Amino acid sequence: MGEPAFTSFPSPPVLGKLKRNMMPWALQKKREIHMAKAHRRRAARSALPMRLTSCIFRRPVTRIRSHPDNQVRRRKGDEHLEKPQQLCAYRRLQALQPCSSQGEGSSPLHLESVLSILAPGTAGESLDRAGAERVRIPLEPTPGRFPAVAGGPTPGMGCQLPPPLSGQLVTPADIRRQARRVKKARERLAKALQADRLARQAEMLTCR
């Protein structure tokens, strides 16, 4: 009797050797973008912040830690600044001088000169009194004074300005009067809308 023939069966595939990625391509791309953004955020947090208010050009800010030997590095011209400013623009404004229409240099206007233009009688008062008291300007034009024209101030003409709204007192009677006006306006609007609606309905019926 002969020996039985040896039959071999194929072995199952080894799963450990398969390195196939089962993640979809779109999800994998989104994961890579998220990881790159997180890496950039970590790198940005480790760097010093940039100051944008003290100068037009960006420069790093000195970090101040609670240590007695720490000193803030600054320039000599910055020691009197109360808050960061745009120093370049500030210096350009300091270099500018007001000029007249003929090109001649003129001194800047002070508060007293402005008050003398608006109300000639208040030029000699002190600034505290001028700030505390409201300047009363008459609404009616006085003889010899004319209202300002739209083209600009004319030499020899006075300036007529309305009184400031902050100086007018609002009474309960004014509030009630305004409420009555609003109510009447709403009633007129409701009547007009109703008449318009009826006219439209009548027009639609006639068109049919």
Swiss-Prot record:
Keyword terms of this UniProt record: Repressor, Transcription, Transcription regulation
- The answer to keyword Chaperone applying to this record is no
Q: Where are the transmembrane segments?
A: none
> Does Repressor count among this protein's keywords?
yes
Q: Which Pfam families match?
A: MBD_C (PF14048), MBDa (PF16564)
Question: Quick one: a GO cellular component term?
Answer: nucleus
Q: Name one GO biological process term.
A: DNA methylation-dependent constitutive heterochromatin formation
Source domain of life: Eukaryota
Alphabetically, the GO molecular function entries are:
methyl-CpG binding
The family note in this entry says: Belongs to the MBD3L family.
Q: What else is known?
A: The MBD3L proteins are encoded by strongly repeated regions of the 19p13 chromosome. The exact number of functional copies is unclear, and some of them may represent pseudogenes.
What is this protein's record name? Answer: Methyl-CpG-binding domain protein 3-like 4
Organism listed in the record: Homo sapiens (Human)
Q: Where is the organism placed in the taxonomic lineage, from the top?
A: Eukaryota, Metazoa, Chordata, Craniata, Vertebrata
